[in-house]
């Protein structure tokens, strides 16, 4: 197997780029990417894509993520973590009750200003490079979503609190920590940060690597995860020989979804966030039961005067991933085509 995922745990103290170099050296491969950079001072899940799996990285970047982080109250650093310089102090430590109660204020849609020490670009230059040169960095506010936030532990003696959060892409935990502290009439920065989950990738079965000598290529590949694993909750279409040929050559092709889908239904659902900020959305969902696995898939739909579209589906040919794309009525439009097999026609 040459196209797969690896569930890697990045240790604290090395950059995501350094870990990529280590994995490349072990595997002897150059087509390797990762989903979601972690700061040097952070640790945790960093999914790696090998070979054709790199074409699916954008799906993982969009996936929900979970973190556990510890905030030190009373000080603020220029980087938002312990690697930066202290730029302000305000020794005001919240009570345990306040540290727990503040969480509800942040659940839902929130607006963040990214930290100056970030990989975002300002006029073509990475923000952290400008910040290191002590140049003024102005970044635009960004919208993000906090699905869950709770305090796990409060230590009054050391003026720290540990939190768990589940959030959307683009969420800066350092900014969240600073905003939490400000809401508690204090200052704060992150002293520990661990990413515990990215989509289907969890820390309990992650591979821990610090150097190329710690694991062999064979041992690493034995822990590989099939390329289709992150597509398990996305609608799959099985292509015929003629459909596969059309997709392979970049052509649009038709699928008879009413015939292919064993179970089709539309229903409205509402998603609510509790707290000061509430969001409710209504959409339609396609339900399909896969007879071979017994699993039921739920996909968002746009239904208007008989028009059906699905933003993301994947196509399988002879049991192997062929393409991902969108379905507009019966027409499949490919976004990525994969070269996983030579078994064509």
From Swiss-Prot:
Keywords: Isomerase, tRNA processing. Belongs to the pseudouridine synthase TruB family. Type 1 subfamily. The active site is at 39 (nucleophile). NCBIfam families: RPE1, TruB. Disulfide bonds: none annotated. SUPFAM superfamilies: Pseudouridine synthase. The gene is truB. The keyword tRNA processing applies. Gene3D superfamilies: Pseudouridine synthase (3.30.2350.10). PANTHER family: PSEUDOURIDYLATE SYNTHASE TRUB1, TRNA-PSEUDOURIDINE SYNTHASE. One of its GO terms (molecular function) is tRNA pseudouridine(55) synthase activity. It comes from Rickettsia peacockii (strain Rustic). This is tRNA pseudouridine synthase B.
């Amino acid at each position: 197997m040459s196209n797969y995922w690896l569930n890697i745990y990045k240790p604290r103290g090395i950059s995501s780029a350094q870990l990529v170099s280590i994995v490349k050296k072990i595997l002897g491969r150059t087509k390797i990417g990762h989903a979601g950079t972690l700061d040097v001072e952070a640790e945790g899940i960093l999914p790696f894509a090998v070979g054709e799996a790199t074409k699916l990285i954008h799906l993982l970047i969009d996936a929900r993520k979970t973190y556990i982080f510890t905030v030190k109250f009373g000080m603020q650093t220029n980087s938002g973590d312990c690697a930066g310089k202290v730029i302000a102090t305000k020794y005001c430590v919240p009570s345990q009750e306040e540290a727990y109660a503040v969480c509800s204020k942040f659940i839902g849609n929130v607006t963040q200003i990214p930290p100056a020490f970030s990989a975002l670009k300002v006029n073509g230059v990475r923000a952290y490079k400008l910040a290191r040169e002590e140049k003024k960095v102005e970044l635009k506010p960004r919208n993000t979503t906090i699905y869950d936030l709770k305090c796990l532990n409060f230590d009054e003696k050391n003026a720290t609190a540990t939190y768990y959060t589940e959030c959307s892409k683009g969420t800066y935990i350092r900014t969240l920590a600073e905003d939490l502290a400000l809401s508690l009439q204090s200052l704060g920065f992150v002293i520990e940060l661990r990413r515990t989950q990215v989509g289907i990738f969890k820390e309990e079965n992650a591979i821990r690597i610090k150097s190329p000598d710690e694991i062999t290529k064979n041992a690493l590949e034995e822990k590989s995860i099939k390329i289709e694993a992150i597509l398990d909750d996305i609608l799959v279409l099985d292509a015929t020989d003629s459909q596969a040929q059309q997709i392979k050559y970049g052509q649009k092709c038709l699928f008879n979804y009413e015939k292919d889908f064993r179970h089709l239904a539309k229903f409205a659902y509402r998603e609510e966030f509790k707290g000061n900020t509430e969001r409710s959305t209504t959409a339609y969902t396609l339900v399909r039961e896969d007879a071979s696995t017994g699993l039921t898939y739920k996909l968002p739909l746009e239904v208007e005067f008989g028009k059906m579209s699905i933003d993301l589906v994947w196509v399988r040919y002879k049991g192997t991933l062929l393409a991902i794309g969108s379905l507009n009525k019966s027409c499949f439009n490919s976004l990525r085509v994969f070269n996983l097999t030579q078994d064509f026609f």
